[in-house]
Regions:
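PLP-dependent enzyme catalytic core of the Aspartate aminotransferase-like
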Residues: 8, 25-28, 358, 367-400
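Conserved PLP-anchoring active-site segment centered on the Schiff-base-forming lysine
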Residues: 121-137
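N-terminal "arm"/small-domain region of PLP-dependent enzymes with the aminotransferase-like
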Residues: 12-71
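Conserved N-terminal alpha-helix of the aminotransferase class I/II PLP-enzyme fold
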Residues: 58-112, 119, 134, 142
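Active-site phosphate-binding strand-loop segment of PLP-dependent enzymes
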Residues: 143, 154-211
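Conserved active-site segment immediately N-terminal to the catalytic lysine
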Residues: 204, 218-229, 238
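Conserved PLP-binding catalytic core of the aspartate aminotransferase-like
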Residues: 319-355
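Active-site C-terminal subdomain of aminotransferase-like
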Residues: 39, 228-311, 324, 400
Length: 400
C-alpha cells in the first residue's frame, strides 16, 4: 500500500505531481523522522548514476561519462559539475543569498554544533542560545565547553510545546552570535518565520528538519546548517551556508584546519573527499523541488497535509496535539493519548502503534521525551498518506 510523490513528467503540472501518489507503490507509509522519504524520481535518477554518471552534473539525456558516481574522483570535471550545480541550486531553489558561501560538509548537524562554536565565537564574548529542545540543548553543551554560554530564552517549563518569545535584544547584545533551532523534530515545534536578530549580532540557525519546506528569509541568518536526511537527500551530507565576511574573522582560539569554514570555502567543499553520492542526490532533490514549482508550490502542499492532521487531532476525544497553536511544525506532527491515567494512556498508545504498524503505517512512535506519536511528513511524503492516517485514526477511535 501507499506510495511517494510522483515524478514530474515533462510538461506536466507541478502542483498535480506534488499531490499524486506514485505509480510505483511502497509497502509502508514511511513517517520516519530521518533518514526520510525521498521522491521516486530521485531514486531512479540516483540509481542511473550508480550505474553510470552522466555529463553536466547528471543532466537528463546527457552522455554517460564512463564511470559510476560511486567510483569517480571528486577532483574530476564530471564531479565538479555535480557539486557546482548543487551549490547553484541552493541559491536558486532554497533562496540562499549570494552574499553567503554554500558548503557541503560531513558529520551531520552534530558536528556543526561544535564547528560553529569554534569558528564564530569571538574573544571575550559569550555565545547566546534559545533552548527549544534536545537539539538546541546539544548545541548549547558544545558551546559551554568552549566558553561562556547564555540561554536567553527557553520553553523547557512546558516540555517544549511552544516556541518561546524571541529574546529581548539586550539579552544577547554582547554575544558573538545568537543560535536558534528553527524546527524541533522531537517536540514538533517550528518558528513561523525566521526572526531578525538586532544590534548586528549574527543569527545562527539550525534548520535541519524543515529546510526546503517553504520559502524562508534565510538572508536573516549569518550562518545556517541542515542535515540533508530530512528534506534534502540522504544522510552523510550537511548543507552549510555562511556569510562571506565571517570567513575572514579570526576565531577566539585555535581551530584545527579541517574544522575551519574558511578551509572548506577556499576549496569549495573539496578540501577532503566529500560524500560524492550524497551531494549528487541532494542536487537531484533540489532539481525535483525546482521542477515541482519551487518552494511556494511545495509549501502549499505541506500546509495542506499538516492542516489535515492537526484538524483531526484537535477534533479527537482520544488524541491531543503536543505543540501549541502558533508553534506547530508542518514537518513533524507530535501527539499523545488524551486524558486517561498514565498506565491507560501507555496501553492505548501501544495498542494504536501495533495496529498502525499492521495497517502499514511505519515510524509513528514518538520520542521518549514526548511519548505518544510522531508523524514526519516531509516534502516527498504524499498527501494520500496523511489522508490514510487520518482515516485510520478516526476508525481506531470509533472502535474504542
Amino acid at each position: 500500500m501507499g506510495g511517494n510523490l510522483g515524478a514530474v513528467a515533462a510538461g506536466g503540472s507541478a502542483l498535480a505531481s506534488l499531490a499524486m501518489v506514485s505509480a510505483k507503490p511502497a509497502k509502508l507509509w514511511n513517517f520516519s523522522a530521518g533518514p526520510a522519504i525521498l521522491p521516486p524520481e530521485v531514486f531512479e535518477r540516483a540509481a542511473d548514476a550508480v550505474h553510470e554518471l552522466r555529463a553536466e552534473g547528471h543532466a537528463r539525456g546527457a552522455k554517460g561519462v564512463g564511470m559510476s558516481i560511486l567510483e569517480i574522483s571528486h577532483r574530476s570535471k564530471p564531479y565538479e559539475a555535480v557539486t557546482f550545480g548543487a551549490e547553484q541550486l541552493c541559491h536558486e531553489v532554497l533562496g540562499i543569498p549570494e552574499t553567503h558561501q554554500v558548503l557541503f560538509l560531513q558529520g551531520g548537524a552534530s558536528l556543526q554544533f561544535a564547528m560553529l562554536a569554534m569558528n564564530l565565537r569571538e574573544a571575550g564574548k559569550p555565545a547566546a542560545y534559545v533552548d527549544t529542545g534536545v537539539w538546541s540543548q546539544k548545541a548549547i553543551a558544545e558551546s559551554q565547553g568552549l566558553g561562556e554560554t547564555l540561554t536567553v530564552a527557553s520553553s523547557a517549563a512546558t516540555n517544549y510545546d511552544r516556541i518561546p518569545a524571541f529574546p529581548d535584544a539586550a539579552s544577547y547584545a554582547h554575544a558573538s552570535y545568537l543560535h536558534i533551532t528553527t524546527n524541533n523534530t522531537i517536540f514538533g515545534t517550528e518558528y513561523a518565520e525566521i526572526p531578525q536578530a538586532e544590534g548586528g549580532v549574527p543569527l545562527v540557525i539550525d534548520f535541519s528538519s524543515h529546510a526546503g519546506s517553504r520559502p524562508m528569509a534565510l538572508e536573516r541568518a549569518a550562518f545556517g546548517y541542515a542535515g540533508a536526511q530530512k528534506n534534502l537527500g540522504p544522510s552523510g551530507v550537511t548543507l552549510v551556508y555562511i556569510r562571506k565576511d565571517l570567513l575572514a574573522k579570526k576565531p577566539a582560539a585555535h581551530v584545527p584546519v579541517i574544522l575551519r569554514y574558511a578551509t572548506h570555502a577556499k576549496e569549495p567543499s573539496l578540501y577532503n573527499t566529500p560524500n560524492t553520492f550524497g551531494v549528487l542526490v541532494l542536487k537531484l532533490v533540489l532539481e525535483w523541488m525546482r521542477d515541482a514549482g519551487g518552494l511556494p508550490a511545495i509549501a502549499a502542499v505541506n500546509e495542506r497535509k499538516a492542516s489535515k492532521l492537526y484538524a483531526a487531532l484537535d477534533a479527537s476525544q482520544v488524541f491531543r496535539a503536543h505543540a501549541q497553536l502558533g508553534s506547530r511544525s508542518r514537518m513533524n506532527v507530535t501527539w499523545t493519548a488524551n486524558g486517561a491515567p498514565e498506565a491507560e494512556r501507555e496501553a492505548l498508545s501501544e495498542r494504536f502503534l501495533k495496529q498502525a504498524q499492521a495497517a502499514g503505517f511505519d515510524g509513528l512512535k514518538g520520542h521518549r521525551l514526548v511519548g505518544g506519536f510522531r508523524a514526519s511528513i516531509y516534502n516527498a511524503f504524499p498527501e494520500a498518506g496523511v489522508d490514510a492516517l487520518v482515516e485510520f485514526m478516526a476508525e481506531f477511535e470509533r472502535r474504542l
